[in-house]
């Protein structure tokens, strides 16, 4: 059984017991979270596709950890000006473990 959920502007294909990193959520570690934006639920041959979401479908998860991703390096270079600007960015994420698909 798997489902497709939407969180943080992205879509994820999830199964029970799976761990994944999503955009930062305001839930403390060890807390439970419920995803209501379920776009698709598949249980064997029974496939339910939402328009835009599946009515009554919910995916529950447990927050494992919060953290920051790898650094993305940015370089702005101005030709012939002897000028450049180096910057970096590390995006916050929340690691969740899927506990149930209903």
Swiss-Prot record:
Biological process, per Gene Ontology: translation
GO cellular component, as recorded: cytoplasm; ribonucleoprotein complex; ribosome
GO-annotated molecular function: rRNA binding; structural constituent of ribosome
Alphabetical list of InterPro entries matching this protein: bL21-like, bL21-like_sf, Ribosomal_bL21, Ribosomal_bL21_CS
UniProt KW keywords: Ribonucleoprotein, Ribosomal protein, RNA-binding, rRNA-binding
Alphabetized NCBIfam families for the sequence: L21
Assembly: Part of the 50S ribosomal subunit. Contacts protein L20.
Its biological purpose: This protein binds to 23S rRNA in the presence of protein L20.
Family as reported in the entry's similarity comment: Belongs to the bacterial ribosomal protein bL21 family.
Protein name: Large ribosomal subunit protein bL21
Taxonomic path: Bacteria, Pseudomonadati, Pseudomonadota, Gammaproteobacteria, Oceanospirillales
Gene: rplU
């Amino acid at each position: 059984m798997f489902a497709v959920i939407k969180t943080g502007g992205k879509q994820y294909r999830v199964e029970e017991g799976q761990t994944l990193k999503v955009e930062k959520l305001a839930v403390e570690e060890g807390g439970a979270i419920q995803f209501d934006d379920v776009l698709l639920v598949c249980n064997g041959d029974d496939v339910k596709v939402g328009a835009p979401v599946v009515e009554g479908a919910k995916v529950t998860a447990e927050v494992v950890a919060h953290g920051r991703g790898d650094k993305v390096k940015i370089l702005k270079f101005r030709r012939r000006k002897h000028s450049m600007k180096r910057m970096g960015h590390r995006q916050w994420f929340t690691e969740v473990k899927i506990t149930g698909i209903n």
